[in-house]
A protein has these predicted regions:
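Generic, well-ordered alpha-helical segments
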Residues: 23, 55-57, 70, 96, ...
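Amphipathic, interaction-prone secondary-structure segments
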Residues: 41-75
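Short histidine-centered catalytic/ligand-binding loop motif
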Residues: 9-17, 86-97
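Intrinsically disordered, low-complexity regulatory segments enriched in Ser/Thr/Pro
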Residues: 67-95
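Well-ordered alpha/beta subsegment
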Residues: 93-114
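Negatively charged, low-complexity tracts enriched in Asp/Glu with abundant Ser/Thr
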Residues: 7-49
Length: 114
């Protein structure tokens, strides 16, 4: 697992996907700090890593990245158990708030480079 604060190469994500799940890389994005953790077996592992580094839990959102779909809407999948947060109004594994989805998308687009 690693925390991405600057950029990560798409080729690195492709290697992670091949070594773990085949087509996807799990990631957790901190929308407050504009960083993400990648490469964990579970979103909860990445969430714990970011929490240990001082990220506030309410700003952490789990996604899946599909490197082969880079540049398309299918690159980011909003699906994680850590996203179920009734107190924040998010009752699904997805991210229901459009502003949060936009923030996650913007951060991922900034951090992942071809």
């Amino acid at each position: 697992m690693q925390i991405v604060q600057e950029t990560i190469a798409l080729s690195t994500l492709e290697q992670m996907a091949a070594g773990m799940f085949g087509t996807l890389v799990k990631a957790v994005v901190d929308i407050e700090q504009g960083i993400m953790a990648v490469g964990g077996e579970m979103h909860a592992d990445e969430e714990a890593l970011l929490l240990d580094e001082g990220s506030p839990q309410p700003s952490l959102w789990g996604i899946n990245l599909y490197p082969a779909q880079f540049g398309t809407p299918r690159f980011i999948e909003f699906d994680s158990m850590i996203n179920i947060r009734p107190r924040q109004g998010n009752r699904t594994r997805s991210v229901d708030d459009a502003a949060v989805r936009a923030a996650v998308t913007s951060i991922v687009e900034r951090l992942v480079s071809r």
